[in-house]
A protein has these predicted regions:
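Feature captures hydrophobic
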Residues: 1-251
Length: 251
C-alpha cells in the first residue's frame, strides 16, 4: 500500500465525506450551526484541501490559500497518522479558531467514523443503514479515482480506460460517475444522467451494501442480475480492476 495514495484517499474521500455527512445527518448539521471557519490540510508531497464551514453548510475545496486554520504535515505518512489517531497536528495559523478544531471538528470525525465503520446493530435502523451506505458509495467512488491517479497498479489500469464517463449507480438511490480524460480519473458525485459511455448499476441499496462489505461476489452478482453493466465494457472492466484495490486502502 502506497502512503501517498492513502493520503489522497484520506483527504479527498474520508475527510471529503464530511460535507455530505453534514447535509444528511441532523447531529452533524447541528455541530456546524452558526460556525464560520475553514480548516486547511497541507500535506508535503501530497494533497492539499480545505473544509469550509459557513452558513450551516460545509464544502470541500482544493488548496489551502484561504483557510483560517492551517494544519501542515511534513509527509503523507504524518497526515495518515492524523486519520488513524497516531499524529496530533500543530496548526501554523488560526489559533483563535482552535476550539472548533478540538471540539466540533473532532465530534464530526467521530460521527463520520460511526457511519463509515458502523456497529452491526446500528445498521438495523433503516435510516442509519441508508445514510451509511450512501456515504460509503461516494467514498468508494472518490477513492477509486484517487487510486487510479496515484497508485502504481491503479495507474496501470487507468492507462487502459478510454476517455468518457463510467456511471456508477444504486437502483432507486444515488448515482455518480468516474470521468476519464487522458487516463486521469475524476470522481463526479452528481448523477450524470445519460451522459456516460458505460454504466455499472447495483440492483438496490442492499446489494450495494453487501458488495461494499464483501458479503457477496461482484462477478457472481453480475451473473445473478444483481449488478447490471452496459456500454463500453472495457471501461467497466478496468474500473473494476481499480475497484479491487479500494479494499486494500480502506481496511
Amino acid at each position: 500500500m502506497d502512503a501517498k495514495t492513502l493520503a489522497y484517499i484520506n483527504l479527498n474521500a474520508i475527510l471529503g465525506s464530511i460535507p455530505r455527512l453534514c447535509e444528511m445527518v441532523p447531529e452533524a448539521k447541528k455541530l456546524i450551526e452558526g460556525k464560520d471557519v475553514s480548516i486547511g490540510f497541507d500535506v508535503k508531497d501530497g494533497p492539499a484541501a480545505t473544509l469550509v464551514f459557513k452558513d450551516g453548510k460545509c464544502s470541500f475545496v482544493d488548496g489551502v490559500d484561504k483557510c483560517d486554520v492551517k494544519l501542515p504535515f511534513s509527509s503523507p505518512e504524518k497526515f495518515n497518522g492524523l486519520i488513524d489517531g497516531t499524529t496530533t497536528p500543530i496548526p501554523t495559523k488560526g489559533f483563535t479558531k482552535f476550539g472548533f478544531l478540538l471540539k466540533n471538528f473532532t465530534k464530526l470525525t467521530d460521527l463520520l467514523t460511526n457511519y463509515l465503520q458502523p456497529e452491526p446493530a446500528a445498521l438495523k435502523d433503516p435510516t442509519f443503514f441508508e445514510t451509511s451506505t450512501i456515504l460509503m458509495f461516494h467514498l468508494i467512488v472518490e477513492a477509486l479515482a484517487q487510486i487510479g491517479n496515484h497508485d502504481d497498479i491503479g495507474k496501470f489500469s487507468a492507462g487502459y480506460i478510454t476517455d468518457g464517463a463510467v456511471k456508477v449507480a444504486i437502483g432507486g438511490g444515488p448515482a455518480a460517475a468516474i470521468r476519464a480524460k487522458d487516463h486521469v480519473l475524476t470522481a463526479d458525485h452528481e448523477d450524470p444522467g445519460d451522459d456516460y459511455t458505460s454504466c455499472m448499476e447495483f440492483q438496490d441499496i442492499h446489494v450495494a451494501r453487501d458488495l461494499f462489505d464483501g458479503n457477496i461476489n461482484a462477478v457472481a452478482s453480475i451473473g445473478q442480475g444483481k449488478v447490471r453493466i452496459c456500454g463500453m465494457i472495457s471501461q467497466v472492466d478496468n474500473v473494476n480492476r481499480i475497484l479491487d484495490r479500494v479494499a486494500l486502502y480502506l481496511t
